[in-house]
Amino acid sequence: MLGDAQQLELGRCAPADIALTVAATVVSRQDCRSGLRRIVLDCGSKILGSDRPAWATGFGRLIDHADARIAALSEHHATVVWPDDAPLPPVGTRLRVIPNHVCLTTNLVDDVAVVRDATLIDRWKVAARGKNH
């Protein structure tokens, strides 16, 4: 119904079909001469969940940055390997992350912000938050 990165990677939906993303902020960036380019986002396993099927290429995807991959998660941060041919976003940039498994993300939050055209239009309380027993 909402779509997620697993469905996207399987080709069952397009990025435009994804109805739920996580707003994340770039909190660090690294552009090494050795070629390692990455950013760190302020969203980790406590918001994205840690599900990663063996066939998945990361722990989530980024809207508008199809070649970027979330390579690692800690509780509060996501490390994103950034493509060589794209400029690294500055610290403070807000990015939209598609979680691998949208069910986990909605189970991990108290409410969902409903945004249309960058404007907050509603907030939905997650009535079943944490009720997976």
Swiss-Prot record:
Top-level taxon in the UniProt lineage: Bacteria
BP GO annotations: D-serine catabolic process
Stored Pfam families: D-ser_dehydrat (PF14031)
SMART domains membership: D-ser_dehydrat (SM01119)
Single GO molecular function: D-serine ammonia-lyase activity
Name the UniProt record assigns to this protein: Uncharacterized protein Mb1449
Organism of this sequence: Mycobacterium bovis (strain ATCC BAA-935 / AF2122/97)
Organism lineage string: Bacteria, Bacillati, Actinomycetota, Actinomycetes, Mycobacteriales
